[in-house]
């Protein structure tokens, strides 16, 4: 899959974050990213099919454990993130501006370990 350059991004191949397969758990309303980390996750559109989140994680900030259903994240800038999973394992991930990433619906905490604020759009699938 290729991202088409329509908003000033260089086309970038998509990726699937390779999270630990035993790290996830079903999402509950108690671990909704918007409720757990309202300073970082804002709903910008919601309908029967999707919920779109504007994500801004300040440099050095860390979210509590939360979940997303199956989702696509689009990076609006270069990012270095540390994901921690319920099983205690963690993974550092470098993402590039314009990169689209498939998230297969699991729980995690995220820490911005980069040199600037993280800005992304997350499209959560409801169906």
Residue ranges and their predicted role:
Residues 60-63, 100-111:
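Histidine-centered metal-chelating micro-motifs
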Residues 37-64, 69-73, 122-123:
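A short glycine-rich, His/Asp/Glu-containing loop-to-beta-strand
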Residues 89-104:
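Short acidic-glycine-tyrosine-enriched beta hairpin
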Residues 78, 105-126:
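Ligand-binding loop in jelly-roll beta-barrel domains
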Residues 68-87:
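Glycine- and acidic-residue-biased ligand/ion/polar-headgroup-sensing regions
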């Amino acid at each position: 899959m290729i991202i088409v350059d329509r908003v000033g991004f260089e086309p970038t191949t998509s990726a699937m974050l390779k999270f630990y397969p035993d790290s996830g758990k079903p999402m509950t309303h108690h671990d909704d990213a918007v409720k757990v980390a309202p300073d970082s996750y804002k709903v910008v559109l919601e309908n029967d099919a999707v919920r779109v989140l504007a994500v801004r994680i300040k440099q050095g900030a860390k979210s509590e454990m939360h979940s997303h259903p199956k989702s696509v994240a689009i990076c609006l800038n270069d990012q270095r993130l540390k994901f921690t999973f319920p099983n205690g394992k963690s993974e550092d991930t470098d993402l590039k501006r314009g990169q689209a990433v498939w998230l297969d619906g699991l729980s995690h905490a995220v820490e911005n370990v980069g040199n600037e604020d993280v800005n992304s759009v997350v499209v959560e699938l409801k169906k």
